[in-house]
Amino acid sequence: MNPNQKIITIGSVSLTIATICFLMQIAILVTTVTLHFKQYECDSPANNQVMPCEPIIIERNITEIVYLTNTTIEKEICPKLVEYRNWSKPQCKITGFAPFSKDNSIRLSAGGDIWVTREPYVSCDPGKCYQFALGQGTTLDNKHSNDTIHDRTPHRTLLMNELGVPFHLGTRQVCIAWSSSSCHDGKAWLHVCVTGYDKNATASFIYDGRLVDSIGSWSKNILRTQESECVCINGTCTVVMTDGSASERADTKILFIEEGKIVHISPLSGSAQHVEECSCYPRYPGVRCVCRDNWKGSNRPVVDINVKDYSIASSYVCSGLVGDTPRKNDRYSSSYCRNPNNEKGNHGVKGWAFDDGNDVWMGRTISDESRSGYETFKVIGGWSTPNSKLQINRQVIVDSDNRSGYSGIFSVEGKSCINRCFYVELIRGREQETRVWWTSNSIVVFCGTSGTYGTGSWPDGADINLMPI
């Protein structure tokens, strides 16, 4: 090969390599621009309800013939739709209940700054569960805790923490309230907060951290609500509220709320005579509540809520093993589904039950006279057969030598079914324990299980002699 041919050959090879490098640089540039603007190809919903985007850093190391290019690209995930909860999955089949959470608030109060509370409950958003309670505006080791046995003061506020986190000084005070209910519709939290004078209280409706609506007392006699979670189906939340006598006829209404705004109010209808402190759960396409009759019945009222047409039906749990306290001994107690049993109906305690086909799962105090001990069991035919008393799968949650209190239900949506859980309020202090001047509580929480389980007792556990007075 002569010199001229060598020069031409080297030049051709160099030109080819240069062309390849140029084309690769163009390809890199096109890829970079495409990935950078990919985020704009995602469709956003009309109402702009999206989850915040999370940046992802992509490192691309591209080796070329004689140099290294480090290209860093930041790309956003396409927005995810946030949808209302519809609770359309079936109820989980369970064999009983397994331990889930215990906050030990009273024991911790012996050496730390923990709020004085009562009326606790649990509710979950789509990703996490929270515990709520009505605080007394003071910690336990504080002279303001004296005489906190009283239910309604202007200092009471609704507290909210992750489940299992005691109400410490950093706890969020959601609203002013001496009666409350909370629920998450899939997009945001709704809090119903009642406060004010007994004869002219106000219920505030707080949605997504903002006051949206309110309603005043309609019977001028202690407007009050559930003290456990409300339920939202397809954006409509229902809450049961009562105003009027605690020992005679009262005026109960069911409020329908959408993003914090009251859209409809239905009066109680059906055969229930007195309804307070309902424990509600989704029973698609509606909502079902098991409540407290503080006037005539130790059997619990049932309220069925139709979310679509706002209609209401009510009756009583059929089980002859009744759920309220005080109550007659099981041998003598009765319930015939439609009416109050007129057995030690005056007074009572918040509680829960839920249907399982024709059967009923329920919880109650072990004592039939006082708020002592706690048990759960299933009654065969207890939802459909009058005065049914065949009990199976009994579990002791708190032994009869220890105090209990209010209890209520909350629901958790799993991958294939909706599980039912419950909490028990473990009251300590006044009136029974007169060494101290305060009244407060801790909680224990159980959830339904399809597995096996053992036995135990999960009382509050604080030694009252070690507690601040």
Curated annotation (Swiss-Prot):
Its cofactor is Ca(2+). GO terms for molecular function: exo-alpha-sialidase activity; metal ion binding. Residues 91-469 are annotated as: Head of neuraminidase. GO terms for biological process: carbohydrate metabolic process; viral budding from plasma membrane. Residues 31-469 are virion surface. It is found in: Virion membrane; Host apical cell membrane. Its EC number is 3.2.1.18. Residues 1-9 are intravirion. Disulfide bonds join 92-417, 124-129, 183-230, 232-237, 278-291, 280-289, 318-337, 421-447. Glycans are attached at residues 61, 70, 86, 146, 200, 234, 402. Inhibited by the neuraminidase inhibitors zanamivir (Relenza) and oseltamivir (Tamiflu). These drugs interfere with the release of progeny virus from infected cells and are effective against all influenza strains. Resistance to neuraminidase inhibitors is quite rare. Catalyzes the removal of terminal sialic acid residues from viral and cellular glycoconjugates. Cleaves off the terminal sialic acids on the glycosylated HA during virus budding to facilitate virus release. Additionally helps virus spread through the circulation by further removing sialic acids from the cell surface. These cleavages prevent self-aggregation and ensure the efficient spread of the progeny virus from cell to cell. Otherwise, infection would be limited to one round of replication. Intact N-terminus is essential for virion morphogenesis. Possesses two apical sorting signals, one in the ectodomain, which is likely to be a glycan, and the other in the transmembrane domain. The transmembrane domain also plays a role in lipid raft association. Homotetramer. This is Neuraminidase.
